[in-house]
Amino acid sequence: MCAERLGHFMTLALVLATIDPARGTDATNPPEGPQDRSSQQKGRLSLQNTAEIQHCLVNAGDVGCGVFECFENNSCEIRGLHGICMTFLHNAGKFDAQGKSFIKDALKCKAHALRHRFGCISRKCPAIREMVFQLQRECYLKHDLCAAAQENTRVIVEMIHFKDLLLHEPYVDLVNLLLTCGEEVKEAITHSVQVQCEQNWGSLCSILSFCTSAIQRPPTAPPERQPQVDRAKLSRAHHGEAGHHLPEPSSRETGRGAKGERGSKSHPNAHARGRVGGLGAQGPSGSSEWEDEQSEYSDIRR
């Protein structure tokens, strides 16, 4: 079913591609200018390109990098897949058994996904580009790129070239994934890219590395502020202890006041005040007991 649909689509695309130049000479449809044509090609894959890629995908073999070569020359400027494939194959002998298995399975996964998804995707360049990068990430993660990189770090580092990061987005996507594969892999790749950058750009790379270190500095700030937080906690604890010791002199004064009140004839509720001062604040229950005593006292007087 899918093969039939691809065949019909290719035939229709080829027919439309042959009709399109003749339609541009019609009096009611003036030919497009160079700017319009270039902007249209950048925003959408041309019908001729679509038909060529479809034809290439059908004829490409399952082994090798033929499927990825189909995307090298297109108006959406999606390049780099073929280069990554060739780099992996050329360095496959340097990998251990796990690394070789990863290369075989990941390349096969990417080729299979490209062949099946391309016919179902829009011709808009952003949609095609996102599809390519998404399936690439899926295949790398599915077949455990990080495990292969951790066991073959030296070979992985040798495969990464600074100039490829400037020209091909799939390389950037691959390196970004590798940077998440642990500190050892991350440090090795970062050092290699910085050295290559200095060889190509000279002192400009030193400026970029300085900016990067300045950006990465804020996360180290919290440990420096930690002693201040500890000092603040100690200060609060000191004030808390002082607060706990404050009631002692007040209780003594309350005791002295109670003795003085005992010696003099005071109002009946002075006893209640002395009790509140000696035992601390009692809340609603203390006030209700005092009211009960007052009511009993008034009943006796009656």
Swiss-Prot record:
List of residues that carry Phosphothreonine: T254
Annotated positions of the Phosphoserine modification: S250, S251
Superkingdom, taxonomy of origin: Eukaryota
Molecular function GO labels: enzyme binding; heme binding; hormone activity; protein homodimerization activity
Residue span of region Disordered: 23-44, 218-302
Keyword Signal (UniProt): yes
InterPro entries referenced in this protein's UniProt entry, alphabetically: Stanniocalcin
Residues bearing carbohydrate: N73
Keywords: Disulfide bond, Glycoprotein, Hormone, Phosphoprotein, Secreted, Signal
Subcellular location: Secreted
Predominant localisation class: secreted
Pfam families attached to this UniProt entry: Stanniocalcin
Any single Gene Ontology cellular-component annotation: endoplasmic reticulum
GO biological process: intracellular calcium ion homeostasis; negative regulation of gene expression; regulation of hormone biosynthetic process
Signal sequence annotation: 1-24
Record field: compositional bias (Basic and acidic residues): 227-264
Family, as annotated: Belongs to the stanniocalcin family.
Subunit structure: Homodimer; disulfide-linked.
Reported function: Has an anti-hypocalcemic action on calcium and phosphate homeostasis.
Protein name: Stanniocalcin-2
Gene: STC2
